[in-house]
């Protein structure tokens, strides 16, 4: 109501964590089946209306002052880490999400709840790519004992916006270049 009355639009980010990860390839109509508080709270926070857009996704990238993200954790980890071959996700780097918003959302009337995703990838394969692109020379030990698939199917959003996410190699290269430019910017301060 507030958005309609003020002629503003709300863009809200939800998460793939609203799903328990037992089956993967969740589409826009899949019902949340998670039992933890984080996932439940994100699901309850999803908004739907004429002036609202909720994007379900998973973000990867760099943080400014901490190392809690998967990528920053990996950069700061020991020379040998575990990489889970059966932990599947389909999120996007923050730089690609910013590009998507700028190119496909801000000037559109898009509203509703949609999944925003890349091709599914395992945490092992993702860390392997980051290791190569960032030239880290770390050893990633494949582990298959942790199984979860929170991949999202975003075909409906792709069809509406004509957006095709880049392949994972391109996404990681974009993330790395953004990381380098952010480092240069922070060093100027």
What are the roles of these predicted feature ranges?
Residues 100-154, 183-184:
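Mid/C-terminal beta-alpha module of Rossmann-like enzyme folds, strongest
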Residues 89-92, 121, 152, 163-166:
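Residue-level signal for the nucleotide or nucleotide-sugar donor/cofactor binding architecture
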Residues 1-11:
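NAD(P)-cofactor binding segment of oxidoreductase domains
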Residues 35, 47-91, 95-96:
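NAD(P)-dependent short-chain dehydrogenase/reductase
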Residues 9, 17-55, 59-64:
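Catalytic helix-loop patch of NAD(P)-dependent Rossmann-fold dehydrogenases
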Residues 14, 58, 117:
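Active-site beta-alpha turn of Rossmann-fold NAD(P)-dependent dehydrogenases/reductases
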Residues 167-189:
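Amphipathic terminal alpha-helices
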Residues 95-103, 173:
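Amphipathic alpha-helical segments that line or abut small-molecule/effector binding pockets
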């Amino acid at each position: 109501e507030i958005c309609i009355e003020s002629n503003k639009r709300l863009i809200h980010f939800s998460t793939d964590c609203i799903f328990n990860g037992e089956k993967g390839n969740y589409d826009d109509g899949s019902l949340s089946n998670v039992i933890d508080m984080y996932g439940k709270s994100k699901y309850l926070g999803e908004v739907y209306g004429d002036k609202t857009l909720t994007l379900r996704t998973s973000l990867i990238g760099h943080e400014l002052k901490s190392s809690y993200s998967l990528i920053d954790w990996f950069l700061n980890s020991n020379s040998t880490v575990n990489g889970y071959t059966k932990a599947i996700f389909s999120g996007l780097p923050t730089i690609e999400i910013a590009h998507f918003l700028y190119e496909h959302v801000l000037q559109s009337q898009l509203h509703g709840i949609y999944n925003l995703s890349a091709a599914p990838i395992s945490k092992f394969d993702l860390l392997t790519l980051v290791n190569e692109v960032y030239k880290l020379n770390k050893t990633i030990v494949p582990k298959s004992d942790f199984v979860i698939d929170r991949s999202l199917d975003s075909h409906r959003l792709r069809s509406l916006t004509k957006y095709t996410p880049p392949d994972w190699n391109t996404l990681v290269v974009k993330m790395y270049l953004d990381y380098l430019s952010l480092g240069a910017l922070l060093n100027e301060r």
